[in-house]
């Protein structure tokens, strides 16, 4: 059962170590493909106008209580999360860098070319699709083992410490983050809740499918 997955699978195109800046072509391809899906999903969530992601809600909530912009707060949160990697034994890699570049590019692409659906039902459907895409993309790029993004790295580190399933750890992180953000005044929408409660199972399913297909 995919909800019980407790580690990132290793397949024939997985890198032996995260700190690898000369990976096989197949490893690099799946890293970029996974991050492209991930970024597309993030962009579609924004375009759906059903609510921001949990970490954006946290940034908004903090921004309302301090004299800093949401963008600055987002950067500071990412730095804080990366610092938390140290006691968890997480290491950055090529994927950590490409995570920021590809996802940002895909979000901008979505906002520019994908129109917001005209009715709310279609907006919700788009939000559901976006969460599934982030999960699948996350599963693919994490299996490449070339380094995770800040939040995914925190998830992996906490999973190793707690030995809990990936889905449970990710759900705990997202729900905690959105709860704090909401308490601080951040705006929570249906899409936010779909992401918070759905991303853990979707990432676990993504990992499960990659393992089964390439095993």
What name fits each language-model region?
Residues 2-215:
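Core subunits and conserved enzymes of cellular information-processing
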């Amino acid at each position: 059962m995919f909800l019980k997955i407790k580690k990132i699978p290793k397949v024939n195109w997985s890198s032996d170590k995260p700190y690898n800046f000369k990976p096989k072509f197949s490893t690099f391809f799946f890293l970029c493909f996974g991050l492209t899906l991930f970024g597309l999903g993030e962009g579609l969530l924004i375009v759906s106008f059903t609510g921001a992601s949990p970490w954006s809600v946290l940034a908004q909530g903090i921004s309302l209580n301090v004299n800093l912009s949401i963008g600055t707060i987002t950067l500071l949160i990412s730095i804080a999360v990366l610092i938390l990697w140290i006691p968890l034994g997480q290491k950055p890699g090529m994927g950590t860098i490409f995570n920021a570049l590809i996802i940002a590019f895909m979000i901008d692409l979505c906002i520019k070319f994908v129109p917001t659906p005209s009715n709310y039902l279609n907006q919700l459907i788009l939000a559901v699709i976006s969460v599934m895409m982030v999960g699948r993309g996350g599963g693919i790029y994490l299996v490449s083992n070339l380094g995770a993004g800040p939040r995914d790295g925190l998830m992996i580190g906490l999973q190793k410490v707690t030995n809990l399933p990936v889905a449970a750890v990710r759900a705990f992180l997202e729900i905690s983050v959105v709860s704090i953000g909401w308490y601080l005044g951040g705006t929570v929408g249906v899409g936010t809740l779909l992401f918070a409660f759905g991303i853990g199972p979707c990432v676990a399913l993504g990992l499960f499918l990659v393992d089964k297909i390439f095993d």
